Amino acid sequence: MPAILTHDFFGRDAYPVVADRLGLVTLDEHDAFLLGNQGPDPLFYLVADPRVDPSNRVGDLMHHVRPARLLASLRDALTMLARSERSVGEAYAAGFLCHYLLDSSVHPLVYANQYAICDAGIDGLDRSDATEVHAEIERDLDEMVLFSKAHQTVATYRPYREVLHASDRVLSTIDKLYFYMCLWTYSRTLELDCYTHAMKAFRQVQRLFWSPRQGKARLLGTVERSFGHRRYSLYCAMAHRDRADDHSPFANEGHLSWENPFTGEVGADSFWDIYDCAGGRVPAAVDAFFSTEFGETAAEDLTKNLNFSGQPTDPDGQEAPPEPSRDE
């Protein structure tokens, strides 16, 4: 998943055109749209809330399985909202669609970098470290995006203050969307306040992650490695650094050839090429999503059955597709 700041800035870039199309004018609608741009990522943070049953941790499932049906279910879930909730729900759904567009577009580049690093034959580094490598790549891109867009670093731009704003009323509306999305897509029943718990955990973890000088990151990273018996720290890989740089070695700014690890397609697009292309798809995608004809067939046309990783999937599959082998 491109990280929190990249998705937030993508949403801010897309907001004017989406607001114009949907007539979004209130602060709640604005906040709901930007939350939507985080997609199902907040559900990963349910692990930080022991009050929530583990059966609600469906973030990974949503990222990898039945993407077209998920979007069609989200569209249908809007009909279950009260009239007073509908505009907030539509704003969130439009943001969720933007999250999908960016995720499925940028992820092949992220995974190409990840597999290149993990498969490079470096002693003490292999695919068992993929989660930390993936997070490190996305953290670096996040820092680049922040400095490029806001000319700030996390020393002054604190993610836990600047991002994830929404009232409890907005979160309650989004809870209902997740309940119906998961029920209709995966036959899974979530707790009615699942998303609210996830978002509040996400906010708390972002505060914990804030370590611009990396002192807290080094301390907590050492604890994580020691008690988790891990070679590398996921906390250290995810904690933003005070890095005033609008470049990243993972952005392919030199337009070198790289291969999509999921399709074998070879291209030379940079991160910003892909970011801009995804942004260019937003108007037509929003128009299609909110048309009266939108259903699973139209969702398959929109997604091409690519999941949030940009990986082809079986539209009826119940398991995440396997990762590419080293020979592919």
Q: What are the roles of these predicted feature ranges?
A:
Residues 1-95, 100-328:
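N-terminal leader/auxiliary helical segments
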